[in-house]
Amino acid sequence: MFLEPERDKPHRELSGKAQPFPVPERIPIFPLPNVVFFPKTYLPLHVFEPRYRQMVADAAAGGQCIGMALLKEGWEEQYDGNPPIFPVGSVGRLASVQNLSDGRSNILLQGIERYEVREEFFEKSYREARITLKPRDRDFSMDSPLRRYLLGVLDEYLQTDEEASPLHSLIRPDVSDEVLVNSLSTYLDCTPLEKQFLLEAEHLPQQARRLSDLIQFKLAERRGAGGWG
């Protein structure tokens, strides 16, 4: 059985256009302690553990999908097993797979949609899950004042952080709201838990407001670190 994400008009992306893609109801899960994946973004990964090499091979030969999940706190004690994960993640399509001579691989995932885990399976060397897709409610879009506010906060942040200069490319009218918010959520210097908080927002305006609050908090931290005169 396949799950097909609901899609509105195609969004213009920074690195190409995502196409509707059928997502299997049961997918392999790639849990990591420091990665939160967002729809309409791209994620490069270097795969070296034997169990995840097998996962990539199976996904490439099957449904072409992998679900990224964030490991919960305390994962170190049982990493070789199946430590708990946050139930909400994003599923990606295998956009490219580069197999290396020693069995490792470099892959590129194209974010399709958020998902929620319904049931986990541990029959293979890697974890699988039965999922339900969680598309954002299209009735909740970012209005112009919210977009202007987010871009204003972002501009202020960029003036204080030269290393964040690549984010300047997002300040364009042709970048869709979804690409803007998810790309900022990906590349902003936030902790994995902060990014998970953004991913779990019920709709795009809520994610944008959470993102604005995080940027404001980081600005306040920098002002404090720099002193007040």
Task: Show the residue positions of the predicted features.
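N-terminal low-complexity, acidic/polar interaction/targeting segments
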Residues: 2-229
